[in-house]
C-alpha cells in the first residue's frame, strides 16, 4: 500500500487558524447536513502505521470512525486517543465503533452502534446532546425510525453489495434510500462500495458513504479517495 507523506497534512494543520475542540456541525445545528465520505479504519494492530495511513486522508473525508475488532482494550484506547489527537486540529469528528464506554472515556465526538450494542437513548444520555450517534439499521426502515426517535444523529443502511470486511445477511437497495428521504437525518450507505458502483446509491439520496477497504487497501489510498469523491462531485 502506498501512503503519501504526512507533510501536506501537517501543513494543513499549521495553516489552521481556528483550532476547535468540537466539530462545527455539532455546535451549529442549522448547518447543512454532511455529505461525502465517512472513512472507517481497518483492523490495524500497529498504531503508528494506522496514523500514518490515516493522516493523509483526513482532508478528503467528512467523518472518521475508529473500528478495530482485533485489538484488546489497551490497544483500542491507545489507537482511539491517537486518532482523536489527529482529528481535533482538523475539525473532523471521530466516532467510535460499538464501544460507548471508550467514546465517553476519551471524549470522542460520537459513537456508532450495531445490532447488539447499547441503544441510542443510552448513548445520548451518556455522551450528551452534541454527540454524533449513529445506528446500523441494515435494510429496516422501522428500525431507523425508532433509532431516530431514541436520539440517533444518523442511520446506516447496508450492505448494498457483498463485503469482505463484514458479512451480513441484510441487503439494502437504492429504493430503500428513496423511501427514507423523510427521515430528516443523514443516511449512511455501507457494504462493498467502490467508485464504480456507488452512482445509483448517491443518486438515490445517500448523504454519506462508509468505506474501509476500498480506500485503506487500495494501492494508492489518496487516489482511491479522490475516485469516490468524484462520484459525489466534491
From Swiss-Prot:
UniProt: Mg(2+) binding residues: 98, 117
Enzyme class: transferase
NCBIfam families registered for this protein in UniProt: thiE
Gene Ontology molecular function: any one: thiamine-phosphate diphosphorylase activity
GO CC aspect terms: cytoplasm
Family: Belongs to the thiamine-phosphate synthase family.
One GO BP annotation of this record: thiamine biosynthetic process
Native species: Xylella fastidiosa (strain Temecula1 / ATCC 700964)
Residues where 2-[(2R,5Z)-2-carboxy-4-methylthiazol-5(2H)-ylidene]ethyl phosphate binds: 163-165, 192, 212-213
Protein name (database record): Thiamine-phosphate synthase
Required cofactor names: Mg(2+)
Pfam families hit by this protein: TMP-TENI
SUPFAM superfamilies named among the record's database cross-references: Thiamin phosphate synthase
Listed pathway(s): Cofactor biosynthesis; thiamine diphosphate biosynthesis; thiamine phosphate from 4-amino-2-methyl-5-diphosphomethylpyrimidine and 4-methyl-5-(2-phosphoethyl)-thiazole: step 1/1
Amino acid at each position: 500500500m502506498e501512503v503519501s507523506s504526512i507533510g501536506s497534512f501537517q501543513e494543513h494543520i499549521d495553516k489552521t487558524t481556528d483550532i476547535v475542540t468540537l466539530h462545527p456541525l455539532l455546535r451549529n445545528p442549522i448547518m447543512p447536513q454532511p455529505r461525502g465520505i465517512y472513512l472507517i479504519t481497518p483492523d490495524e494492530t500497529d498504531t503508528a502505521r494506522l496514523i500514518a495511513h490515516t493522516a493523509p486522508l483526513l482532508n478528503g473525508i467528512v467523518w472518521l470512525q475508529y473500528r478495530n475488532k482485533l485489538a484488546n482494550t489497551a490497544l483500542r484506547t491507545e489507537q482511539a486517543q491517537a486518532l482523536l489527537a489527529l482529528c481535533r486540529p482538523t475539525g473532523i469528528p471521530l466516532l467510535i465503533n460499538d464501544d460507548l464506554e471508550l467514546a465517553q472515556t476519551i471524549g470522542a465526538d460520537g459513537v456508532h452502534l450495531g445490532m447488539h450494542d447499547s441503544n441510542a437513548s443510552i448513548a445520548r444520555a451518556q455522551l450528551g446532546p452534541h454527540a454524533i450517534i449513529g445506528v446500523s439499521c441494515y435494510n429496516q426502515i422501522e428500525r431507523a425510525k425508532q433509532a431516530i426517535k431514541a436520539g440517533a444523529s444518523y442511520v446506516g443502511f447496508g450492505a448494498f453489495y457483498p463485503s469482505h470486511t463484514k458479512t451480513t445477511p441484510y441487503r439494502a437497495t437504492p429504493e430503500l434510500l428513496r423511501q427514507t428521504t423523510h427521515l430528516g437525518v443523514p443516511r449512511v450507505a455501507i457494504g462493498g462500495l467502490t467508485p464504480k458502483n456507488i452512482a445509483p446509491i448517491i443518486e438515490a439520496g445517500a448523504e454519506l458513504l462508509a468505506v474501509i477497504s476500498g480506500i485503506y487497501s487500495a494501492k494508492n489510498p489518496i487516489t482511491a479517495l479522490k475516485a469516490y469523491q468524484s462520484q459525489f462531485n466534491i
